[in-house]
Regions:
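Hydrophobic alpha-helical membrane-insertion segments
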Residues: 11-12, 50, 280
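Bacterial Sec-dependent N-terminal signal peptides
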Residues: 1-24, 349, 478
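Short, conserved acidic/polar surface loops in the N-terminal third of protein domains
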Residues: 120-121, 128-134, 197-200
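Outer-membrane beta-barrel porins/channels
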Residues: 135-478
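Short coil/turn segments at secondary-structure boundaries
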Residues: 3, 91-96, 158-162
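Hydrophobic positions within alpha-helical membrane elements
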Residues: 7-8, 46, 276
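N-terminal, post-signal peptide beta-strand-biased segments of exported outer-membrane/organellar beta-barrel
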Residues: 19-129
Length: 478
């Protein structure tokens, strides 16, 4: 029963977030009523507004190839059944969990004649975990296959398992409207400050069973790096290092964009950058002797059940031996390395009709380059440049009612470099009562609007204050 519960938890966690667009909500792009559209294209500014304040807002992204219906269903009125076999069939060779947070801290913008200026700050966290199919199989079947036949050697982990980055961003931008050409151009500079980073380069775990079943041996190897405020000490324990909070681990990025009002058509390229240069509190961690070997020859049942009761001391000893065996035992200082921020590409167009309706089309591409090394004095393999291009096309339809309520529905057609996904609905609500206070809620890249069938979602909500917003019931930007 315990094995089934553990396997069920792993199946639930096995995600494959489309892992894409984790800092973006594409429906914002063609609203023109929200300051957040300018975050995607520096040539965009809220329609009819002369000044705005962007108050703290929150965005969250999560993804999985498994919906609740893939592994759980109800039987009768009160019985919940977990179907692991059905869930296992839905998993691939590598299954990635993605979780992201995009917290808008504060922003403002104002117009001066044909120019406008913007400022924005935010906090971004991205977490990706890869769980190989072999690990889930091993938890469910142990050292046997699905038919119960013994497997002498089981590979349960192989490759990159974890990467996580948290950074702050401060951005300053400007735009200019060229009246004779009906063209607005914009640019933005960003300062990136890295707070914490952890990357696994290679993780291997192999379980070998002796021919006579007298012993099980686990051979483990790992190699990962940490940087920023959350580092490792010489004993391999995590330790906060706040003295490096305001020094090093930084980078710059640039956005450019343009909008042709007669179409209207627009394009933008965001995060042109080498990424974040991690150069403070960096540690490379690997087993001290090159690898770890753990042997288990069984446990005497009379020791475990001493006097008819479960002996917790025996179990605790086994647990401590396991923890001590896999604990990082070699920590080496690394000079520095770079971690790239994905570069985004946008090409959008919209058609406005009857003054209150808008149909929009947006192409969004994203180039992920991952981790790479500028220099490495200790010759530890930090990683190679791995370019991955993901893309999607979002079709949306919006209506502006009463000059203060905008409703948007859309769908994204997504390609992640390996497969194409045609069903990713989205929705948006923008309320601007009294044309001053604005509340927005956006959700897209949702695999289903029905909760038990949804595998992915991207939600963002927040508040803005607009001054000079008249609008006259129009959706189009004047």
């Amino acid at each position: 029963m315990k094995k089934t519960i553990i396997a069920a938890v792993m199946v639930i966690l096995c995600g494959s977030a489309k892992a894409q667009y984790n800092e973006t909500n594409s429906l914002f792009y063609n609203t023109f009523r929200t300051p957040q559209s300018g975050e995607l294209n520096p040539a965009l500014f809220p329609n009819k507004a002369s000044f705005y304040l962007s108050l703290p807002g929150f965005g969250m992204q999560f993804g999985s190839p498994l919906a609740i219906n893939d592994f759980m269903h109800t039987q009768g009125d009160s019985i919940t059944v977990i179907n692991l076999n059905k869930a296992m069939d839905a998993l691939g060779k590598d299954n990635n969990i993605h979780f992201g947070i995009n917290a808008n801290l504060f922003g403002l913008g104002f117009k001066v004649n044909n120019m406008f200026f913007t400022f924005n700050s935010r906090l971004v966290t991205n977490l990706n975990i890869n769980i190989p199919r072999e690990l889930v199989d091993a938890v469910q079947h142990g050292n046997t296959d699905a038919s119960g036949n013994p497997i002498p050697e089981v590979n349960v982990l192989c490759g990159d398992i974890l990467n996580s980055t948290t950074y702050a961003e401060i951005a300053v931008g400007a735009g200019y409207r060229i009246e004779p050409l009906n063209l607005t151009v914009g640019a933005r500079a960003k300062y990136l400050y890295g707070l914490a980073n952890i990357q696994t380069d290679n993780t291997i775990a192999v379980i070998t069973t002796a021919p006579d079943y007298s012993q099980i041996r686990a051979d483990i190897y790992y190699d990962f790096i940490t940087a920023g405020v959350a580092g490792l000490d010489s004993n391999g324990r995590f330790k906060m290092d706040t003295k490096n909070l305001l020094s090093g681990n930084s980078g710059f990025a640039f956005d450019i964009g343009a909008r042709y009002d007669m179409g209207p058509f627009s394009f933008a390229i965001d995060d042109l950058s080498a990424g974040i240069h991690w150069n403070k509190n960096i540690n490379a961690v690997r087993p001290k002797d090159g690898h770890i070997t753990l042997n288990f020859g069984g446990e005497d049942i009379t020791t475990m059940l001493h006097g008819g009761r479960l002996n917790s001391d025996s179990l605790n000893a086994q647990y401590q031996n396991l923890i001590n065996g896999i604990r990082p035992s070699s920590t080496t200082k690394v000079s520095d390395y770079w971690y790239s921020i994905p570069t985004k590409f946008y090409l959008g167009g919209n058609y406005n009709f009857l003054q209150k309706f808008r149909a929009s089309l947006l192409f969004h591409g994203q180039l992920d380059r991952g981790i790479f090394s500028k220099k490495n004095a200790t010759e530890i393999n930090v990683g190679e440049i791995t370019n991955t291009f993901r893309f999607n096309t979002t079709v949306s339809f919006g209506v502006n009612l009463f000059n203060w309520a905008e409703f948007i529905v859309g769908n994204s057609f997504v390609g992640d470099g390996n497969k194409f996904d045609a069903i990713n609905p989205g929705f948006g609500i923008v309320l601007t009562p009294a044309t001053i206070f604005q509340i927005y809620l956006m959700g897209d890249y949702m695999s289903s609007l029905y909760l038990v069938e949804a595998k992915d979602f991207n939600i963002r909500l927040g508040l803005n204050i607009l001054i000079g917003d008249g609008g006259n019931g129009r959706v189009a930007q004047d």
